[in-house]
């Protein structure tokens, strides 16, 4: 049993609370849904000749360093939290890794906020509410149907707006709601005497982590929706967003 941290909420392999079972089912269903979407896209999307490739420098070195550091911290936090919470492997080490990565995540989040306050990157997180519902419907339709038919993306990333409307809302929710809540609940788990709500905070912290896991799964899959599976990932290596214009007479290519 985990006697170091959250022992009263230790979950052995033969005991999972009902809410955690439901959460596991949700994660599994999401993964199945993403696999089905990928298979349908592969089978149904028409093969079109690519047009001329355009490159726009949209991701500064600071943003890319923050992104990769943040991604690494999320992975380490999820793994150390999983191993520590379920007493897999060296629990004491996992708790230490989780704690230090949590403080590092706090530093990275502060850095993210400062970047948005002091550079032009912040404009990409300012929502234009005029026609927002219509734009979200267009983007949802593209993900569900349009991409299967090889339709052009309804919102191309530009220097003025890097994100489509669904991306913008999702990133806002993650970076300005989920991450702060994860940090706050994590600190209250680390210092339970502050609020006296250790067990409650631990459950909430784990639930928020599962939401974060769902986001990561969706984010990684959506990053494969470029002209090639690795195209969008390359943008976080060299900073250039790439897209191809439709060849003349072909309105279906991206």
Curated annotation (Swiss-Prot):
List the Gene3D superfamilies hit by this protein, alphabetically: Transmembrane di-heme cytochromes, Chain C (1.20.950.20)
Signal peptide start-end = none
The membrane topology noted for this protein in its Swiss-Prot or TrEMBL record is: Multi-pass membrane protein
Q: Where does a menaquinone bind?
A: 219
Could you tell me the keywords of this UniProt record?
Cell inner membrane, Cell membrane, Iron, Membrane, Metal-binding, Transmembrane, Transmembrane helix
Q: Which Pfam families match?
A: Ni_hydr_CYTB (PF01292)
User: Which amino acids does the record list as binding heme b 2?
Assistant: 98, 205
Q: Which cofactor does it need?
A: heme
Q: Gene Ontology cellular component?
A: plasma membrane
Which annotated residues bind heme b 1?
A: 67, 219
Gene Ontology MF: a single term: metal ion binding
Record carries keyword tRNA processing: no
Q: Does the keyword DNA damage apply?
A: no
Q: Where in the cell is it found?
A: Cell inner membrane
Q: Which domain of life is it from?
A: Bacteria
- The UniProt transmembrane annotation reads 16-36, 71-91, 97-117, 169-189, 196-216
Which coarse location class applies to the principal site listed for this UniProt protein?
A: membrane
NCBIfam families, per this entry? PRK15006.1 (NF011582)
| Subunit note | Composed of three subunits: PhsA, PhsB and PhsC.
Q: What does this protein do?
A: Component of the PhsABC thiosulfate reductase that catalyzes the reduction of thiosulfate to sulfite and hydrogen sulfide, with menaquinol as the sole electron donor. Proton motive force (PMF) is required to drive transmembrane electron transfer within the reductase. The PhsC subunit anchors the complex to the membrane and contains the site for menaquinol oxidation.
Q: Which family does it belong to?
A: Belongs to the PhsC family.
The protein depicted here goes by the name Thiosulfate reductase cytochrome B subunit PhsC
Q: What is the lineage of its organism?
A: Bacteria, Pseudomonadati, Pseudomonadota, Gammaproteobacteria, Enterobacterales
């Amino acid at each position: 049993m985990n006697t170091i941290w959250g022992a009263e909420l230790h979950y052995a392999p033969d005991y999972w609370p009902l809410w955690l079972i439901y959460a596991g089912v949700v994660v599994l269903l999401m993964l199945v849904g993403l696999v089905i979407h990928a298979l349908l896209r592969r089978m149904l999307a028409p093969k079109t000749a690519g047009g001329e490739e355009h490159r726009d420098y949209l991701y500064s070195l600071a943003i890319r360093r923050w992104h990769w550091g943040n991604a690494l911290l999320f992975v380490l936090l999820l793994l150390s939290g999983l191993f520590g919470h379920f007493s897999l492997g060296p629990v004491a080490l996992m708790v230490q890794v989780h704690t230090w990565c949590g403080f590092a995540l706090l530093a990275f989040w502060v850095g993210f906020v400062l970047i948005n306050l002091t550079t032009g990157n912040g404009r990409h997180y300012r929502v234009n509410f005029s026609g927002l519902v219509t734009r979200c419907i267009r983007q949802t339709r593209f993900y569900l149907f349009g991409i299967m038919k090889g339709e052009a993306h309804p919102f191309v990333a530009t220097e003025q707006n890097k994100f489509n409307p669904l991306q913008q809302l999702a990133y806002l929710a993650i970076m300005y709601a989920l991450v702060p809540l994860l940090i706050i609940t994590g600190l209250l788990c680390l210092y339970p005497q502050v609020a006296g709500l250790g067990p409650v905070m631990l459950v909430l912290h784990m639930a928020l982590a599962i939401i974060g896991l769902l986001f990561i799964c969706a984010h990684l899959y959506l990053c494969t929706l470029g002209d090639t599976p690795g195209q969008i990932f390359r943008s976080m290596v060299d900073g250039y967003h790439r897209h191809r214009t439709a060849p003349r007479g072909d309105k279906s290519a991206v």
